[in-house]
Amino acid sequence: MPLPNHHPLQRPLGCRYQFPDPMAADPDGEGLIALGGDLAADTLVCAYCQGMFPWFNEGEPIAWWSPDPRCIIYPSDFCASKTLKRRIKNAGWTFSLNLAFAEVIAACADTRAYAQASTSATWISPAMIEAYTALHAEQVAYSVEIWDDDELIGGLYGLKLGQAFFGESMFHRVTDASKAAFFVLMQLCAHSQFAWVDCQLPNPHLLRLGASILPRAEFLAGLAQQLSLPSIDWSSICGQKLPLNQLLNEDLMTYYLSPTALQLRKLR
C-alpha cells in the first residue's frame, strides 16, 4: 500500500514511496507520520533520510515515526564515567565492528522479548531482522560487538548515512557491556566528525549516558546537513577484534580510521 503523499518531500533516487513531510503531517508532534509501505532497503533509507523510522509490533501495519522532541547525543561531548573507564581498563574485553551483525540483532530482539514477556511482543520482529540484515549487506547497517574472549557479551546496531548515525538497539549479557559498546560508538562517531547520533526516543538509560533532547524541526534541519556530507570509511576497523582498553587512548581511534590502517589491513 503506498504511503500517504500529503505535503511530500523531494523523493530520493530509487525510493518507491513518497513520504509525507513530518512537520506538516504531524503538526501536534505526536510522532506517527504514516502507515503502510514495506521494509525494502530503499524504503528504509528514504525514511531515515527524511527523519522517520519504523516502529510497530509484529502483525501490525508498518508504522513510520518521527517523534517530537527527538533524542540525540553529541559524540564530541560524550564523557564516559570513571566507573565505566575503570571497567574498560580492567575487564580484558575486546571490541569489533560488523563482525557479528546477525548475532547482535538477534540478541537485541531477544532482550526486547524478555522485557515484554507479559505481552509476548517485540518490535524487532523476524521481518525487521531480515530488513536490517539486508541493509547490513549494503554496508548501511553496522554493529558494534563487545567480547570476553570468544563470548559475545554486548553490542548495538544502527544505520550510517552520510555523517549521520541512527542508533537502533543495544543489549548486554554482562554488566556494562552495552555501555562499553556505546563507548565504542561514541569514539567512532566523534573521530568521524559526526555532529550527533540519533537515539530516537528518550529513556532514562540514554539520558544517564548524556543524551539530549532536540525539537523535531531542529533535528530535521541538522539531519539534512549531516546527510549532505560524505560518509566516513569505517572499513579499516571492520571485521577484527581489537583491545577495548586501547580506546582509552583517544589517538588510537584516529589511527584505526586512518588510510594507513586500511592499507596495512590490505597487506596482511
What label would you give each PLM region?
Residues 1-268:
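N-acyltransferase acceptor-side catalytic subdomain
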